[in-house]
Regions:
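Alpha-helical recognition segments enriched in aromatics with Gly/Pro capping
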Residues: 2-206
Length: 208
């Protein structure tokens, strides 16, 4: 993923591996802290977080009956670890398929004594790839999808970045590949580049 992000001129100082939360015991430690504070209980072989106490209609499973944590527990453990590092503000990026998850994560952070107001949550909607006027049907289960690298290979890094920035994170984006490759006013990037070139030409003439 680092190489892909670099192509878009997005650079990260640090990458974090979720597996380390299991290896260093952070997840077990977080769960034990929940138990010590009386925030969880066992039922039907699973561990439940008392999210009703935080305004939800029902409690939420943190550990399945199989012993496997749900998304929420590692996410909470990661948030605790990051908040302990002393950052004043940070940004969470969630996909729309996890829109029901992040409120529980914030509740977990609050219940452990941290201020969730430091966390700015961005929820990104899905992107629909359109080609030849038709949506490209994607399915990760069927391994039928277009990668970001493939998209950049076809339309270029600058165009890809611009198209994604045209929409707010919570707005669904239809990425029209044909429009992105067109050298006309139908392509907003081409139009912008043309306007920039014209402005530069005017500035050069003024300087003369």
């Amino acid at each position: 993923i680092q190489g892909t992000m670099n192509r878009l001129n997005i650079f990260m100082d640090t990458f974090f591996n979720e597996n380390s939360l299991y290896e260093d015991g952070s997840i077990d430690k977080t769960l034990q802290t929940f138990r010590d504070k009386g925030l969880v209980y066992d039922k039907d072989g699973a561990v439940w977080f008392k999210t009703i106490d935080f305004g939800k209609e029902k409690d939420t499973v943190l550990v399945k009956s199989t012993g496997e944590p749900t998304y929420r527990l590692p996410d909470i453990a990661y948030h605790v670890k990051k908040l302990e590092r002393g950052f004043d503000i940070w940004v969470d990026v969630f996909g729309a398929d996890h829109i029901a998850t992040y409120p529980d994560v914030l509740s977990g952070v609050e219940s452990l004594g941290f201020d969730s107001k430091q966390i700015d949550v961005l929820v990104y909607q899905f992107v629909t790839i359109v080609k030849d006027g038709k949506p490209f049907k994607m399915s990760t289960r069927k391994a039928n999808f277009v990668t970001l690298d493939e998209l950049m290979d076809e339309v270029g890094e600058d165009v890809t970045r611009f198209f994604f920035l045209m929409r707010a994170p919570g707005t669904h984006l239809e990425f029209d590949i044909d429009a992105a490759k067109e050298a006309s006013e139908k392509n907003p990037v081409f139009y912008l580049q043309y306007a920039h070139a014209r402005i530069q030409s005017i500035l050069r003439k003024v300087a003369e």
